[in-house]
Amino acid sequence: MTCGTRSSFSLVHWLEAPVLGISSLPLPPSLSSDTSAHPPLSLSLLILEISSARPFLFRHIIDTPTLPASPLPPPPTPLHSCKNCKRFSPIILYSLPPVLLMAATFVPAHTAFFGAKKEIGARSSFSPSISAHRCRKHALNKVLAVMAPTQPSRAPATTGSVKHGMTMTEKILAKSSDRSKLEPGENIWVNIDVLMTHDVCGPGTIGIFKKEFGKNAKVWDREKIVIIPDHYIFTSDERANRNVDIIRDFALEQNIKYFYDIKDLSNFKVNPDYKGVCHVALAQEGHCRPGEVLLGTDSHTCNAGAFGQFATGIGNTDAGFVMGTGKLLLKVPPTMRFVLDGEMPHYLLAKDLILQIIGEITVAGATYKSMEFVGSTVESLNMEERMTLCNMVVEAGGKNGVVPPDETTFKYLEGKTSLNYEPVYSDESAKFISEYRFDVSKLEPVVAKPHSPDNRALARECKDVKIDRVYIGSCTGGKTEDFMAAAKVFLASGKKVKVPTFLVPATQKVWMDLYSLPVPGSGGKTCSQIFEEAGCDTPASPSCGACLGGPRDTYARMNEPMVCVSTTNRNFPGRMGHKEGQIYLASPYTAAASALTGYVTDPREFL
């Protein structure tokens, strides 16, 4: 049996085989160079594999033996004599039935995708054209390489060799891994610039860190860890409050420089260190910088990609490892390119654009891929609108989203950070797995109907949907510009809302902006004044609020079946509370217009 054998055996079936065991995994340079400088560790690695036939997540936690303080033992005998597989000999497999092991031998190893360019206008729909080419290499090579990446030997360039460019994401990861060249699918040890965690995942991350590195271990860099309580804050729930206590104790113990604490829950304004929603606070406090790698224990960490950096969410196990080493094993994602051109209509916002995109490619369309946003429309967006674009790439399955940094980016960062940063941009010869083009001038306001962000519909097509409430807030739709947009609709209508309208600023700064910044064209009125005249609820304490449900006493939580138009990012059953609640995701324009009528409403009725 050779590695060149073809078979139709499904990779998905193979991935459903029992857990794989590993012996002798390679370590990050900082650990492997001098094992005597570190105590023995027990690592847990997350293995991700994507099926070529369809988006498919293969995730196993594999515990390795304690790392020896002496040189690693010699590699075991290779599984077979295939020359293509010998380089992975440090790995052995067990607990794999012989039948599956034999079947796996037939599995194609690599897949190259070719996505046709798409021209997209109003109301267009399509299924991305993807064709798969199956390689002849041994299937085990692919999986083994994911588990134990090796540095391939590179021969000197020969006459006539072609230098291929890299995408933004590839360049950032190359720089952070001290590599001159990277390609999608490679597994690399990345040096992390910023690690963020919050009150929901922080306690778990801290627990794993202490278990694996020792109760008295110190974090790798106290100035590169940001801890932000924001999710379950203004509640009497004891478990939620205990989580905040845990991250506070850890921050004090480790002398974490950037811990944005809140102690008095009765009045957030007396807590000068408290910020609010982590993703918006990271930007406002200068932790988002072009060309860097930012990881967070929250899926919407991709929000920071608006600054031209690699930002993605990770689990507690990975975060615990990063806390102790400052490194993480990452697989380089391929990049999808989204070109948005045309003048932005006055009735559209970035939320309409990202809902349009997700509706086109589906919630699985960008699975473990980078989404790069370019074009004249993107260049015209302010930083908060760019953050909205990148925030929801994870709703399409994306690994990360990026916007090329420009003068708008640099101006936003002035006064927010004193650290130097190095912007990077995609090469002209960079390879993209697919490209989608949108003529933004032809698009209309859209919503995502229950119960999925890709269940897209034109807002005007949902005019008969009666609603019970409107919610304006979250990391996606609770920024200053989002409230300015809502106030613009209320001001233009001169009417009062017909359903309860809840306002939850993302951060303290946003809250203060609502009471201090005049709304353009209002004659000096602030958002808070316009909201009061329209009959909205008083702006609440800044936090994640009801975006993710939370304890029963969370402000604006849906504790009974209701229909809600929301500027948040997810609408699966139970997301904002009651499992029978229905959530229509929309832009602040559409949310405000709907509040005025009591039905899902196209904002062009008022703008």
Q: What residue spans do the PLM features occupy?
A:
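Fe-S-dependent hydro-lyases/dehydratases of central metabolism
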Residues: T2-G4, D63, N84-L607
